[in-house]
Design a protein with these regions (language model features):
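N-terminal helicase ATP-binding lobe
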Residues: 1-216, 220-341, 347-352, 356-372, ...
Length: 440
């Protein structure tokens, strides 16, 4: 299967049934190829037969559970299914209700993987509340984290599979469903976790071969080709099948469902000067609350200091487990902002939802499309709410600075590659990361 790049071809010259000249206009990823599809009045799906992919591309925005009730899902075979729908469309509810109930009826087990501990804990609490409420009374917060069996699901965060014991645990079981929620994070997190690709493939190869593999995301662009590739690798060799009229059925290994997106509730505002937007927040009415995604811990602490401890709280991946642990757990449990401003790093891009009618402002110091969609999605809207979305547009100088950092990093990678290729003998402490880590 050609999963990396597809080509859109323009026919320049044709004679009879023969094409004499073809011009390659653009390389296309699978996601771009799907975007290029034209509406078809006769059917809502399109097969890419050479790639064994079927795309359903005409679903209106609605709750996932309405589109995939139990009677439809029961007809699914042990193949791959990608569900692309924006945040707030009930993907997690579909998992904890529809799929969980199916598993209980069939006396089967499902494996549920998420990229964030916060999202894992959210799933565990919801499944426990529905199917084993006694666990919520018996277990402490740490106990909930260590427990993995909740009703019909085994629930893990992807980071836990750095442990060989966790890998052995899933290899010893037979799963009816393997569900990867927020699956885009397997690529997005690779910048700070070099094992995400290995974990992704390991989970599907070891636990997913004989299961229905479900991938959930609102931002599939960075992961779709990898999903298609691994689906080809783990799918058994095709056995021709025929319909009732004797026509061969298409060899579909991966089915993609794309739901329409609706961001009509968003009022976008772009800015470059950080001080300007800070001034606006300092004068924001006390009746409104704001969610601010900063670039770094340093920036987050600066914003907290300028807005004041009485109005703002800063959380990151570290202090949510230490001095901010109680506040973070309250946020997970009640999904409300305690102070006027919640300042966070990107650790909260998935897994934490805020159902707060007073939250009217979201500020992003991130401009990648995946970041914008996921961070905006932490605010869950109801009715006719309008959200002001402030997005920083980097200056030319800032962009040049980032380009310089990338060029320096690329040069360092090249030097390390040459060192390894030439097998230069050196002390162990001089080896490049990750071949050496200073243990303390």
């Amino acid at each position: 299967m050609a999963t990396g790049n597809y080509f859109y071809r323009k026919i320049l010259e044709r004679k009879g049934n023969y094409t004499l000249k073809v011009k390659i206009l653009k390389k296309m990823t699978l996601n771009e190829r799907i975007d290029y599809l034209q509406p078809d009045i006769y059917r809502i799906f399109k097969d890419f037969t050479n790639e064994h992919v079927r795309v359903y591309n005409a679903f209106a925005k609605q709750y996932i559970s309405n589109m995939f009730p139990k009677d439809k899902v029961k007809k699914w075979t042990n193949d791959g299914y990608v569900i692309i729908a924006q945040t707030g469309t009930g993907k997690s509810t579909w998992v904890t209700r529809t799929i969980a109930e199916m598993l209980l009826e069939d006396r089967a087990t499902g494996l549920l993987i998420t990229p964030r501990v916060a999202l894992t804990m959210q799933y565990k609490r919801e499944l426990a509340k529905l199917y084993c409420p006694e666990l919520l009374e018996e277990l402490t917060e740490q106990g909930i984290h260590k427990q993995h069996e909740y009703g019909p699901f085994d629930v893990y965060s992807l980071q836990e599979f750095l442990s060989a014991a966790k890998v052995r645990a899933i290899k010893s079981k037979r799963y009816e469903f393997v569900i990867l929620d927020e699956v885009h994070a397997f690529v997005g997190d690779a910048a700070f976790n070099p094992f995400t690709e290995k974990i992704f493939r390991l989970l599907l190869q070891e636990a997913g071969r004989q299961a229905k593999r479900v991938y959930l995301t609102a931002t599939p662009e960075i992961i779709l080709d990898e999903i298609a590739q691994v689906e080809e690798e783990i799918t058994p060799e095709f056995i021709p099948r025929y319909d009732s009229l004797g026509w061969p059925k298409p060899n579909i290994r991966l089915t993609i469902f794309r739901f329409a997106r609706d961001y009509g509730y968003v009022q976008p505002i772009f800015f470059q000067a950080e001080e300007e937007i800070l001034g606006k927040m300092e004068s924001l009415s006390g009746e409104k609350r704001g969610l601010i995604f900063v670039r770094s811990v340093k920036q987050g602490l600066e914003w907290q200091a300028k807005l004041g401890d009485q109005r703002a709280v800063f959380m990151n991946a570290q202090n949510k487990r230490t001095e901010r642990e109680d506040e973070f757990n309250e946020l997970l449990r009640y999904q409300k902002i305690d102070k006027q401003f919640l300042i966070v790093t990107r650790f909260m891009d998935v897994g934490v939802n805020v159902h707060d009618l007073q939250l009217k402002v979201v500020i992003l110091f991130h401009a990648f499309p995946e970041d914008v969609v996921q961070m905006l999605g932490r605010k869950r809207v109801a009715g006719n709410e309008v959200v002001q979305l402030y997005i920083e547009i980097p200056s030319i100088g800032a962009l040049k600075q980032e380009v310089g950092k990338l060029e320096n990093a690329e040069a360092e990678i090249g030097r390390n590659r040459e060192l390894l290729k030439n097998r230069v003998i050196m002390g162990i402490s001089e080896l490049p990361h990750p071949f050496y880590m200073q243990m303390t």
